[in-house]
C-alpha cells in the first residue's frame, strides 16, 4: 500500500502523522510512503531524514493526497484537505466528529473510509490511540493553568504550589481518566491542593491507591461540582464519552461563582467541551475571559509540544497503520473489533453509534457495512 503523510495545517499544529522511524518500519514491511515537503519540520525532522528512512518527498499536499491509498495525519482534515480526499481512500487520524457537523457532512459526501484514532478501543476497555495525547494534555493542562494564574496573564497572582507559610492553589479535576490522572500527577508534584471528582467509585479508589492522602477524592454530583468549582483556583475538565459530545458539567452560573482571575482548562474541547462557557481556541490566541474567569480551551493542546506528542502518538499508531496497510483496510477492520470501533464514516455512511447519535444521522453498524 502507498501511505501519504501531509503537513499538518491547523493553526500552530506542528505534529506529523509519521516519524522517520515509523516510515522505516513501514517500508521494511514492503509498503511505500510519500511525505509532503517540510512535514516533519515542526518536530526537528528534515526531508532528508524521511528520504533516508525510505520515503519519497512530494512538493504539495495535493501531490500526497493524489498518490496515496491511505492518508495518515494527526488532526482532523481541514476544509482544503477534505476536498482532496477521494472516494474509497483511507483516512487515519483524529476526527472528533460529534461537535463538528460541517466536517462530518463533507466526509460523508466525500466517500472516504474515515478511521478515527479516538474511538479505536482495546481489550481492556481503553482507548489506546487517544491515551498518549490525553497523557500529554493532562500534564500540559496544569502547566497552562499555572501560567495563566500569574497576574500578568489575567490570573489571581497565585503560585500554584504556594510557599512555606502561604496556602497553595486549589486544583479541581473533573474526571479521573487518563487526562485526570496525569493532571493530578503534575498538580500534586507542583504542591497544589488537589481534588478529583468522578462518578465511578472504582476510579476514585484507584486514584486514592495511586496517589495517597495528598489527593482528595469526591463522588461527582451537581452539588459537589458546584461546591468545589466555586472555591477552586483552577478547574481542569477531562471528561469523555467516546465518540460523543462531552457532557456540560460546569454551568455558566458555576463559572460566575468563581473568583475573578481563576482559570479553567477544558481538555474536552475537542469533543465540544465540558464547560457551558467553552469554545475552541488556538495556540495563537489560547485564552478568553468570561465573568472574570480565564478560559484555556485550545483544541490541539499536545500540538504545543509536537516532538514529544508525535513520538508518543507513533508508538501507539504504528501497529494499526501496519495492519491496515498489510491486510488492507477491509480485512484489517473485519478481523479486529477494536480497530473496527475506529470506523466513523465509510463510503457515505456513519458507522459509529455515538457519532451518529450526536449528528442525528442514520447509523449503519460497521459490521453491516463491511459485510455489504
At which residue positions do the language-model features occur?
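Glycine/serine-rich phosphate-binding loop and adjoining beta1-alpha1 elements at the start
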Residues: 2, 8, 79-170, 298-300
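General beta-strand structural signal in soluble alpha/beta enzymes
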Residues: 5, 34-37, 57-59, 65, ...
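Glycine-rich phosphate/diphosphate-binding loop of Rossmann-like nucleotide-binding domains
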Residues: 6-45, 152-237, 287
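Short glycine-/small-residue-rich Rossmann-like dinucleotide-binding loops
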Residues: 69, 75-76, 95-96, 221, ...
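Adenosine-phosphate binding glycine-rich loop
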Residues: 118-159, 269, 274-372
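Rossmann-like adenosine-cofactor binding region
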Residues: 209-291
Amino acid at each position: 500500500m502507498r501511505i501519504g503523510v501531509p503537513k499538518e495545517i491547523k493553526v500552530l499544529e506542528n505534529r506529523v502523522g509519521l516519524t522517520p522511524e515509523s516510515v522505516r518500519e513501514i517500508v521494511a514491511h514492503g509498503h511505500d510512503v510519500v511525505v509532503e515537503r517540510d512535514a516533519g519540520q515542526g518536530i526537528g525532522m528534515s526531508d532528508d531524514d524521511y528520504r533516508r528512512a525510505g520515503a519519497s518527498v512530494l512538493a504539495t499536499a495535493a501531490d500526497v493526497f493524489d498518490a496515496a491509498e491511505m492518508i495518515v495525519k494527526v488532526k482532523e482534515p481541514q476544509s482544503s484537505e477534505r476536498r482532496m480526499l477521494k472516494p474509497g481512500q483511507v483516512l487515519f487520524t483524529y476526527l472528533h466528529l460529534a461537535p463538528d457537523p460541517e466536517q462530518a457532512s463533507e466526509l460523508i459526501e466525500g466517500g472516504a473510509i474515515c478511521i478515527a484514532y479516538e474511538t479505536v478501543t482495546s481489550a481492556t476497555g481503553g482507548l489506546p490511540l487517544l491515551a498518549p495525547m490525553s497523557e500529554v494534555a493532562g500534564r500540559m493542562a496544569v502547566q497552562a493553568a499555572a501560567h495563566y494564574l500569574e497576574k500578568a496573564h489575567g490570573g489571581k497572582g497565585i503560585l500554584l504550589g504556594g510557599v512555606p507559610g502561604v496556602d497553595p492553589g486549589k486544583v479541581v479535576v473533573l474526571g479521573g481518566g487518563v487526562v485526570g490522572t496525569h493532571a493530578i500527577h503534575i498538580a500534586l508534584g507542583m504542591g497544589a491542593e488537589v481534588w478529583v471528582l468522578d462518578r465511578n467509585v472504582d476510579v476514585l479508589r484507584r486514584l486514592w491507591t495511586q496517589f495517597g492522602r495528598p489527593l482528595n477524592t469526591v463522588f461527582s454530583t451537581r452539588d459537589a461540582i458546584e461546591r468545589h468549582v466555586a472555591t477552586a483556583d483552577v478547574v481542569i475538565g477531562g471528561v469523555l464519552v467516546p465518540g460523543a459530545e462531552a457532557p456540560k458539567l460546569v454551568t455558566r452560573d458555576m463559572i460566575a461563582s468563581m473568583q475573578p482571575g481563576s482559570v479553567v482548562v477544558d481538555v474536552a474541547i475537542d469533543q465540544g467541551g465540558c464547560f457551558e462557557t467553552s469554545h475552541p481556541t488556538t495556540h495563537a490566541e489560547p485564552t478568553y475571559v468570561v465573568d472574570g474567569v480565564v478560559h484555556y480551551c485550545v483544541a490541539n493542546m499536545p500540538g504545543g509540544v509536537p516532538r514529544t506528542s508525535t513520538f508518543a502518538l507513533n508508538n501507539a499508531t504504528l501497529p494499526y497503520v501496519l495492519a491496515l496497510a498489510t491486510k488492507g483496510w477491509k480485512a484489517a477492520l473485519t478481523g479486529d473489533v477494536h480497530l473496527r470501533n475506529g470506523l466513523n464514516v465509510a463510503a457515505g455512511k456513519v458507522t459509529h453509534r455515538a457519532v451518529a447519535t450526536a449528528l442525528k444521522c442514520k447509523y449503519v453498524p460497521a459490521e453491516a457495512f463491511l459485510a455489504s
